[in-house]
């Protein structure tokens, strides 16, 4: 991997972003869809992570705020993880097998501000306990299957969430790299 000139790569976000730029169209990961492996490039990985980080920042994520992810391993999990870290937040995984009571404990113990749910099953758990989670600001759902008629001011789809990041990127094209550069190796 070729290091970008004049950039000290001393944090995970900087290493990630350097990889995105230097590896561009190379395969970053693969996901099986209906039995067929789909390739995801570093460019796509980077863009989704960037939009995620920008959306989190726009919605009020501050340095060291916690973002919890209740999902099986999937590309969206990785986009959210890198977007969170790049925006200065802390990423926290929640097992999909955890009960609603366990989710409540984890969300409260970590002071989670943003909660990503893989699907309706994971959404139901956080909805059951959210009134007892005072720090929770926003719930984002990756897969809205079965939720087309569902409306709640605290819940948005990942697709809608990414549009917030797209708008932020258009308004402030240098914001993402600024956020990455504000993350320190001591964080």
Where are these regions (language model features)?
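Domain-wide signal for the mature, well-folded portions of proteins, strongly enriched
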Residues: 30-32, 69, 136, 141, ...
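Structural core segment of the AMP-binding/adenylate-forming
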Residues: 86-164
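Conserved AMP-binding/adenylate-forming core of the ANL superfamily
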Residues: 28-82, 99-104, 154-162
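Flexible, non-catalytic linker and terminal segments flanking ANL/adenylate-forming cores
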Residues: 1-12
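Short hydrophobic/charged patches on amphipathic alpha-helices used for structural packing
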Residues: 17, 53, 103-104, 177-180
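AMP-dependent adenylate-forming
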Residues: 15-40, 146-147
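Conserved pre-ATP/AMP-binding loop-to-beta segment of ANL
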Residues: 24-25, 155-156, 163-187
């Amino acid at each position: 991997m070729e290091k970008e000139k004049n950039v000290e790569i001393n944090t995970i976000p900087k290493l990630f972003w350097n990889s995105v730029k230097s590896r561009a169209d190379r395969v970053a990961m693969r996901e099986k869809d209906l039995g067929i492996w789909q390739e995801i490039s570093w460019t796509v990985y980077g863009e989704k992570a960037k939009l995620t980080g920008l959306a989190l920042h726009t919605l009020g994520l501050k340095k060291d705020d916690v973002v919890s992810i209740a999902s099986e391993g999937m590309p969206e999990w990785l986009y959210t993880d890198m977007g969170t870290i790049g925006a200065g937040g802390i990423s926290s995984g929640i097992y999909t097998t955890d009960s609603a009571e366990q989710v409540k404990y984890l969300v409260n113990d970590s002071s989670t501000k943003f909660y990503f749910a893989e699907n309706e099953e994971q959404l139901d758990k956080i909805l059951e306990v959210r009134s007892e989670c005072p720090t929770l600001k926003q719930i984002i759902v990756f897969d809205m299957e079965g939720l087309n008629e569902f409306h709640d001011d605290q819940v948005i789809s990942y697709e809608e969430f990414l549009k917030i990041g797209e708008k932020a990127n258009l308004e402030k094209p240098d914001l993402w790299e600024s956020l990455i550069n504000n993350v320190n190796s001591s964080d």
